[in-house]
Each structure stands twice: as structure tokens, then as C-alpha cells.
Amino acid sequence: MLSIQQNDLITQTGAGTPAGGLLRRYWQPAALVDELSGNRPIKPVRLLGEDLVIFRDERGRYGLIGRRCPHRGTDLAYGRLENGGLRCAFHGWLFDINGKCLETPAEPDDSNLCANIRQKSYPVVEKNGILFAHLGPGEPPALPHFDCFIAPNSHTFAFKGMIDCNWLQSLEVGIDPVHTSFLHRFFQDEDPSQAYGKLFRDTSRDSDMPMSRIMREFTRPRIEVEPTPFGFRLVTLRQISDRSTHVRVTNLMFPNAFIIPMSREMTITQWHVPIDDEKHYWYAIFTSFGAPVYKDEMRRQRLALYQLPDYIPNKNKNNDYGFDPHEQEHETYTGMGADINVHDQWACESMGAIQDRTTERLGTSDKAISAYRKLLREAIEKSGKGETPIMVLDPKQAASITGPAAIDGIGPAEDWQGYWQKSESSKRQAASWTNGN
């Protein structure tokens, strides 16, 4: 358990807070490219407690600036895109992607007011369907060469969803390899040929055993937490027989992302990004090591589950997450349908807006959560001292952080380490875009 002060330290992310200062040192997802794809590419964004507006100008450049016009505080999200920037609808003040004031049209011709005005702005980069922003001071760090960033656009798909609670409790679910045996338990296995775009519905690599069966029948895994330059690797072992072991390799990508295998050919890189301290978005890039991603199918599957424009889940606390007692008895462990995002959403939101960690009791199976909190506290302390925390990278360091491995397969019990490494290598050798690396 944590003290109130310890919990506040790692959950509060507004401007001026220790964790907020840390998270601002990294690139954070701010919006999907899809959200700015229409005729009016302007969207209000709340990120780390800051109210902002993201837009694409006529030249295709992205900008992220303060939402309130510095003139008299009106909402720039209702502005006009023209003349190289975003124009306030109140008095026509015009700002470019860097927050520079280009025009104050009601002022006298000889006025220098415009030259003295600078709207808050943050740099934006696009990576495979997600617009990332850097809200911290100084030069942004280099982005690591993760698979999700270097894969061609044809082999990736990006999506997001809102969760009505603090970011940390959702991130901790993502590095908890035991909950899948319970929270995501399906009493019947799906035909793998119908599993495209779904987590835990494919067969495990090098076997004909569905992932859902493995999670259901083997509920006491052995968990290895291995420190890495990017955070840590999680290796979860479920002994299937005297001769074979199920090996699942996942990763914590500091500060607020994880990478997991979705199927034999696809991985998910998922960030949990604070809107404020009591709600957040998950952002995900799905990366295929096989055929190009069927983006239309992936999008169709997910848009059926979310309400736009804010990506609010159709199943939520207001309708009891679709809970069905009959389904809970006969089909799923939760009775909340087949979408595992709903299961995770219920688990996280039911802890409260900000989980009270002063009353929790962690067990042996929570070792990754304990490891992450230690890493987070150390990084907060370093950042507070003006030192460079883990994963604030220069270009050379970023180029050295590749992959990482993310595998779900069944191999020989006596050499599970050799098995997953060979399996990962085989996956990469077969991919069209990895150059075998």
C-alpha cells in the first residue's frame, strides 16, 4: 500500500506537479490523424490538464496552441483556418502553428501589438496515425525506433478510447499479466479464422491452442520482470505440460506505454495519456508483421463500439457496461460482452476516479506493478533534480532502442528463453518491412 502523499505523487499530472513535469518531457499522443481528416481540421484537446486546440493549416502543417485567445479569452476551437493559421472568430486575430500572432486586423496599421503577442504552443509530429505533442520545456527528445514508428503506414492502424479514471490504474492493468486469466476469460473459444482484429482470440504461435483457452485453464503463471533500457520486459510463463510452456513476452515502455502481442502476426503499442487527473485516453497503434492491415475492417469494428467525436465507449458506467447475468454464467467471466476494452474499462473505473492505493494489498503476481512504481518514482526524483530520466533520448540513443519483442507462443519447457527469441527472430525475418531485424 502507499501513503496518500505517495499516491498523489504518481497520479497527479497537472502543470507544476512532479509527475506532470516528468510526463511533459516525453512525446505524448494528442489526437488521431483521423480526427483532423475532414474539411475543417480543427479539434479542441485537453491534455495533462491543459486546454489546447490542434489544427492543420493549409500547408498541411500541424499546430497545437492554447485554446483561449490571448485577446479576450474566447475559444479558438471555433476559429477559421485561413491565411496560414487559425483565426479567432471574435476579432480576427490570427495565429500560426508556432503560436506567432500574424494579424490583429482591428488595430491601426502602425500598431505593434501583434509583434508583442505569442500564444502558447507546442511542437507536433505525426507517427502512423497519431499526432504526438511535446508539452515540456527545451528541445523535445528523439523518438525511439519502435516497430510501431518505423513500420510502413500500410502495416499499422491507430485508434483511441476514453476511460473515466486516472491514467495510472489503466497503465497498471496493461502490465498485469494475470488478470487476463480472469477478467478476459471466455468460456468458449472462437474460430481463429474469425479472430482478425481481436485480442486473445487467435491461436498461440507454434500451436493450435487458442489464447483464450490458455488464459482460461492456466491461471497461476510464473512472471519474470527484466529491466531494459526502455523500461522492462515481462515474460509470463504458463506450464502446459512437462514438455511445453506457454511464453508471453510483453513490455513496459517508459513512461506510459506498453507493447503486447495481439495475435501471431500483430502487436499493440498502447499509451495511457491523462486528459486530466480523473480521465484519460488510451491510444493504440496496431502493427502487422504479416499482411498489410485491413484498416477499414479495424476501423469498422471499433467505431461500432464508440461514440464520436470524443471516442466515448458505448458500454460505460451509465449503462452498467452492458452487464448481463446470463452471459456471466454461460459465456464470459464479466458478463460484459466480448470487447476486452470494456472489461478493462470496468476494472479501472470501478476503482474510482483516482484509486485509493492506501488500502490495496499487492501480491506476488503484482511484481510488475511494484517494479513500475519504483521506476516511476525514481524518474520523478531525477526529473525534479534537473537530471535526465530514462527514455529522454538523443538521436543516437533513440536509434539503439528498437523492437521490442512481443510474442505469444508455446515452446519447449526446458528452453523457453531460446524459444521466444527464435520465435521473435522468425517473425521479423518473415516481415516485409523489417529487413530481417
Kindly give the residue locations of the regions a language model identified.
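Short, charge-rich amphipathic segments
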Residues: 2-4, 18-21, 100-109, 299-314
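A boundary/linker detector
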Residues: 1-27, 31
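A short, structural micro-pattern
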Residues: 24, 118, 125-127, 266, ...
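C-terminal catalytic domain of Rieske-type non-heme iron oxygenases
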Residues: 15, 61, 138-437
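Tryptophan-centered short beta-strand motifs
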Residues: 21-22, 27, 62, 101, ...
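Rieske [2Fe-2S] iron-sulfur-binding domain
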Residues: 1, 15, 31-157, 222, ...
